[in-house]
Amino acid sequence: DAMDACYGNPSSGHATGLRARALLDGVRERARRMIGAGAGKVIFTSGATEGIQTAVLSALCAVRERQAAGETVGDLLIYGSTEHKAVPEALAHWNRLLGTGLTLRALPVDDEGRHRLDVLRQLAPRAAMVCTMAANNETGTVSDLAAIEKVRLVSASRAYWMVDSVQALGK
């Protein structure tokens, strides 16, 4: 329906573009309310890979700024072993291009597909970034995000945390 009625470029000033902009703004506002984000905090991308690339690049640029300022930064980029393959690929790519010199480390999961919190407790103090899924799109396993957050808080980790929440949205 949207492509029939609102096919215009939402960045243009003509009538079809203005209709597309209104539709896009309405969807963005509904998404913002659904996830509890502030105004101007929802970005639409073309898909999972672009969203992951954007989040990883943003976080690793911030890590590099911390390094340049002489701040203590963890040496690990931790990602759930069942993450979308774009996650470790993006981490490796931007780590190399930005020259952050960090080590990638897969966080194992247990027999039910849940992140091994015992391993995360050991690694969290060394983390510069942690990447996890809220819900696995292949197995349906739901991550215990509150427990992961508790590990991060107890470890006093300043690591950036990216959560792929697409599969959990609205549940």
Question: Where on the chain are the PLM-derived regions?
Answer:
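Pyridoxal 5′-phosphate
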Residues: 1-171
